[in-house]
C-alpha cells in the first residue's frame, strides 16, 4: 500500500523549473526578446532551430529544436501573449506528456524589470526522460540567464 501511495504521489508531482531575475532593462524590452522565437538559435545554448507556425496578436504557436550531447528533440507550444506582461506556454507536440509554464515581466521602473520563468513538465515515458531529461532541464534552467545576456 505504501508503494502504491508513493507511486501516486510520484505521478502527481511534475518536475518544475523556476527562475527569477532583476534586470536593468524594461519589461517591454525583455518581453520582445523572449517573444522573438525565430532568434533563439542565435543565443540560446542547445537551440538548433525555431519557427513560428501560426501567429495572431494574442497567440503564437511555435516549434523549437533542441540538441545536446547527440540528443535532438523538437517541441511545439501554443503561447498566450499579453503584450509586455506575460507569455503563457502550453504543449502542442513533443516528447512531453505535459508541458505548461511561462514568463512574467514586472516593471520596476522605466529601465528595469523582474523576469519570472516557470515550467512544469513531464516526459511521455521513462526512456525519453532518461535520454533527454537532464539535457532539457539544463537548457530550461539556463534560459533566464541567456535572455539577460542577450539583452546586453
What are the roles of these predicted feature ranges?
Residues 4-57:
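Hydrophobic ligand-binding cavity/cleft-lining segments
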Residues 30-34, 40, 62, 115-117, ...:
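Hydrophobic pocket/interface hotspot
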Residues 22-26, 65-69, 80-82, 92, ...:
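Solvent-exposed residues in well-ordered beta-strands and their adjoining turns
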Residues 17-18, 72-76, 98-101:
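Short, surface-exposed coil-to-beta transition loops
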Residues 38, 136, 140, 144, ...:
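Short amphipathic alpha-helical signal-transduction/dimerization elements
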Residues 6-9, 77, 119, 149:
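Generic detector of N-terminal low-structure segments
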Residues 91-142:
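Beta-strand/loop substructures that line and gate deep hydrophobic ligand-binding cavities in soluble
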Residues 51-95, 146, 150:
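Glycine-rich portal/gate segments that line the openings of hydrophobic small-molecule binding cavities
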Amino acid at each position: 500500500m505504501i508503494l502504491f501511495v508513493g507511486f501516486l504521489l510520484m505521478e502527481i508531482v511534475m518536475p518544475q523549473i523556476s527562475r527569477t531575475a532583476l534586470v536593468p532593462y524594461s519589461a517591454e524590452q525583455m518581453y520582445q526578446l523572449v517573444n522573438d522565437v525565430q532568434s533563439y538559435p542565435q543565443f540560446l545554448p542547445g537551440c538548433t532551430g525555431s519557427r513560428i507556425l501560426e501567429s495572431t496578436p494574442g497567440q503564437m504557436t511555435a516549434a523549437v529544436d533542441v540538441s545536446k550531447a547527440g540528443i535532438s528533440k523538437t517541441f511545439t507550444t501554443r503561447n498566450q501573449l499579453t503584450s509586455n506582461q506575460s507569455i503563457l506556454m502550453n504543449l502542442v507536440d513533443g516528447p512531453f506528456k505535459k508541458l505548461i509554464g511561462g514568463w512574467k515581466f514586472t516593471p520596476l521602473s522605466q529601465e528595469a524589470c523582474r523576469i519570472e520563468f516557470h515550467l512544469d513538465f513531464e516526459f511521455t515515458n521513462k526512456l525519453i526522460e532518461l535520454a533527454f531529461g537532464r539535457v532539457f532541464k539544463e537548457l530550461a534552467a539556463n534560459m533566464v540567464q541567456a535572455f539577460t545576456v542577450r539583452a546586453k
